């Protein structure tokens, strides 16, 4: 897909190139999360967007708005991610967003949310959900700390930082 070619020309990779060993090792895990994940791409992007929003990461949010559109999320759904889980989402999407929020705020998925997830996802998918949110929390910390600049053409949201 075009977004993958664009992603690898992104400012984040230029910054990470300052530490080639870190970049090489992180890419193995990040590649699983982004392209070998057992979660559907649309759902993966819901998780990443919510994580980016929760972490106040303009770069992560903007990059993944582009990717989210490419995998079928509408602009209305993307905006709704900023509001978090609500009854406007279907049960599966709401469970994903609740899990992302719990992982961000509590650093764990609560028992009730785990049961909700089990209604929609396999154990493998739940583990990939945790890995996705965890990876993008790390990425947001990196992006926010090193102040990686937005790439050209990536949407900015002034509500973030």
Language-model segments: what does each one mean?
Residues 83, 92-130:
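Acidic/histidine-rich alpha-helical segments that form the ligand environment
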Residues 13-16, 26, 30-33, 46-52, ...:
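Short alpha-helical scaffolding segments that buttress acidic/His motifs in well-ordered protein cores
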Residues 116-118, 142-161:
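Acidic, carboxylate-rich catalytic segments that either coordinate divalent cations
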Residues 39, 45, 51-71, 75:
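Conserved alpha-helical segments that form or flank metal/cofactor-binding pockets of metalloenzymes
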Residues 23-37, 111-119:
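Short amphipathic alpha-helical segments and their helix-coil junctions
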